Amino acid sequence: MLIACTHIIHGQISGCTDPLANNYNPAATINDGTCTYPPSSISPSRSINLPSIINETSGLVIDGDSAWTHNDDADINLYRFSIKDIGYSAFPLKGAKNIEWEDMSSDEVYFYLGDFGNNSAGNRTDLRILRVKKTDVLKGSMTFDTIRFAYEDQIISGSQAANTTDFDCEAMAVIGDSIVVFSKMWTTQKSVIYTFPKQPGSYIAKKKAILDIGGLITGACAIPNKQLILLCGYSRLLQPFLYLLYDFPGTEYHAGNKRKVSLNIPFHQVEGIATSNGLMAYCTNEKLVQSFLEINPAFHSLDLTNLLKQYLQGGNSAIPEENSSGEIHIMNQKDNVIISGHPSFLGTPYRILNLEGDVILSSMIETQSFSLPTENLSSGYYLQYKSYLK
């Protein structure tokens, strides 16, 4: 049986497209990056202490059921452990030097180790990223390439007091053919986004944008095909947080949704973050000893379903999940309306109507997913009849 229903297709209206935001505009079809959010916090669904040998865990990568991390001072080992327990293996990167390894990232072939910590004096001239093949790591015969960079807007004229520079960095993500780094600005608690190629060589890191974080960024990871970046960090009072960037256009990482989420693990110096699907993330904190407390290094599981599922798997201006049901999905983009459906709809006619019921467009569904240019549609509201197979 075919049951007809209606779906409103909006004209090209800019605004906040996230239903979870304070200022969500259901009529908006273009995300203009203005979404604001209520204060929110999450608690780890699971936390396990790490071995003492990884007291200064700094970066984190998830690869299947394995987590990879490293320390940030002198130690040249990569450490692999299961996300289910703390049994670990060490893989030394022979011939390398760890000045301040602060984060790691990966693509299909390589691990990338960011030796770019710069908080002690703010005047390093040897910022670099080491690139090593994953297969070489597992074979124990590691050789590495070097990617060197300098910030385009930094003029080095001497040293600064520790933890005062705006050119420290502890976070990076490999996205496409680029490395994206996020600075740790100690004075303003903002973060500048820089990019440069991921191929070995020497580069000037180009400044793309600045994020008003209100905290110190210490780790990053990305799911490029979902337009999603997760950042982690902490406040000066050691209140850890996540900072989510998502639904941004192209490589304009600052131009989409920006949401800060507190982590209910106070005084944990969170340093690394990783995810494989955006719904379950993982972070690590290094050992912290103060006069009034001692925090062990740990690995935390973070369920982000309530924060990101609607975006990742459906919803306005969101990325639809793979359609295996008898339903037609509609997604509005800047210049097109994307229509996708079950293969059983091939050969089915469709039509788009305005609110007066006039047929504006009609045709036949010839492919499982196709786009309709909106340039010939005047701004306004339209009705699109879709059917469900019952």
Language-model segment annotations:
Residues M1-G15, P39, A318-I319, D358, ...:
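Bacterial Sec-dependent N-terminal signal peptides
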Residues P320-K390:
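C-terminal outer-membrane/trafficking sorting elements
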Residues A21, P26-T29, G33, N225, ...:
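Disulfide-stabilized cysteine-rich extracellular repeat microdomains
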Residues H7-P38:
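Primarily marks secretory-pathway-exposed extracellular/lumenal segments that are disulfide-
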Residues N23-N31, Q160-F167, S340:
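Short, polar loop/linker segments at the starts of domains and inter-domain junctions
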